[in-house]
């Protein structure tokens, strides 16, 4: 007869033993993910004791965005600081930002990013040629989708904000 805690010879867990997965404690990260875990987690056969405490909404109705949700004439904290883009900006509207008119550049060198295509997107090139194509100097010009100049004119310390 096999000893308790050992799997029988033909494989599978021994009868009457728990798998080691059930015995392992939950990692510490679990507690960080669930803030007041012990208070409201459902236990077997017991009703929930308490609910997680949600912070009450400070301003605006339910479901309404709180940041940058004012009408275009009003100044709110996020909009007034100039650091954030307005959420209420319509599709045709051009924002004035650090680079001039238009949005901040997505690819600073001004070319279409070839890296963004997954390998199956270019089946016609073998991998070696693909890398050679990426190594060619990309044409310089205005940033993608923007009317601003690249590199930006003015203070060279523009990166430090």
Swiss-Prot record:
Low complexity biased stretches: 1-16
Region called Disordered, residue ranges: 1-23, 50-91, 140-161
Coiled coil regions, renumbered to chain: none
Name the record gives this protein: Putative uncharacterized protein PAK6-AS1
Organism from which the protein derives: Homo sapiens (Human)
Lineage: Eukaryota, Metazoa, Chordata, Craniata, Vertebrata
Protein's gene: PAK6-AS1
């Amino acid at each position: 007869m096999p000893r308790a805690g050992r799997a029988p010879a033909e494989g599978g867990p021994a009868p009457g033993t728990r798998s080691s997965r059930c015995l392992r404690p939950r990692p510490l990260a679990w507690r960080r993910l669930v803030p007041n875990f012990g208070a409201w987690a459902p236990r077997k056969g017991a009703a929930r004791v308490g609910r997680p405490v949600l912070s009450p909404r400070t301003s605006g109705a339910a479901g309404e965005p709180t940041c940058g949700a004012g009408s275009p004439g009003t100044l709110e904290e996020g909009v007034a600081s100039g650091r954030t883009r307005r959420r209420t900006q319509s599709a045709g509207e051009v924002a004035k930002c650090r680079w001039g008119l238009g949005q901040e550049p997505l690819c600073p060198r001004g070319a279409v990013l070839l890296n963004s295509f997954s390998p199956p997107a270019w089946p016609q090139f073998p991998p070696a040629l693909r890398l050679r194509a990426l190594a060619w100097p990309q044409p310089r010009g205005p940033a993608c989708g923007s009317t601003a100049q690249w590199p930006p004119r003015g203070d060279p310390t523009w990166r430090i904000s």
